[in-house]
């Protein structure tokens, strides 16, 4: 778990929101934390609480879909990299980043198509990169690609955040 949380998912915390929370309520929560002087930065993200189906060549597996609000800012919270070469990847509107074990399970490589199903709608996407990961299976896509595929904005249901000067003790308390 050390590599996962110190090198790959490098945010201090995540807040899951109920479906009924409004954008205004989210801003109020974030402004309050900001005013308390605790918040360094934050970003909203759609993170499916239930896995969705990802399939390729007749193989289907469960995967969690993650759609960060800001494809440029996501690099401050997560590192997408090749496990062996260390090459860093960035989310683009051209396709998805798939975690390594899922890519192996589906037997797909960079440039291959996969199908992902959201709310019963199966869409084809291209695997642009395959990233190192040790916990669960994820597929990452930009908000712009999500909108293009599904005709609506992602329903942001979580907030990733970093605290100012957070020590390991403060984070665990």
Where are these regions (language model features)?
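Short beta-strand boundary microenvironments
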Residues: 5-13, 22-113, 122-126, 130, ...
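Short, strongly hydrophobic transmembrane alpha-helices
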Residues: 1-2
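Small-residue transmembrane helix packing/gating motifs
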Residues: 7-9, 90, 130-172
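Short, charged/polar "capping" segments at the starts of alpha-helices
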Residues: 20-27, 167-172
């Amino acid at each position: 778990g050390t590599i996962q949380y110190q090198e790959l998912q490098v945010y201090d915390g995540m807040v899951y929101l109920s479906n009924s929370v409004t954008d205004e309520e989210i801003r109020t929560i974030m402004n309050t934390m900001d005013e308390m002087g605790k918040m360094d930065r934050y970003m909203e993200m759609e993170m499916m609480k239930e896995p969705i189906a990802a399939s390729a060549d007749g193989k289907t597996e469960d995967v969690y879909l993650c759609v960060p609000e800001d494809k440029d800012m996501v690099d401050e919270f997560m590192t997408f990299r090749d496990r062996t070469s260390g090459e860093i990847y960035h989310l683009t509107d051209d396709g998805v980043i798939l975690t390594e074990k899922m890519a192996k399970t589906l037997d797909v490589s960079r440039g291959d198509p996969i199908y992902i199903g959201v709310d019963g709608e199966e869409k084809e996407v291209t695997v642009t990169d395959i990233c190192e990961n040790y916990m669960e299976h994820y597929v990452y896509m930009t908000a712009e690609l999500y909108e293009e595929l599904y005709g609506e904005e992602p329903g942001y249901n979580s907030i990733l955040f970093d605290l100012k000067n957070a020590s390991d003790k403060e984070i665990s308390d």
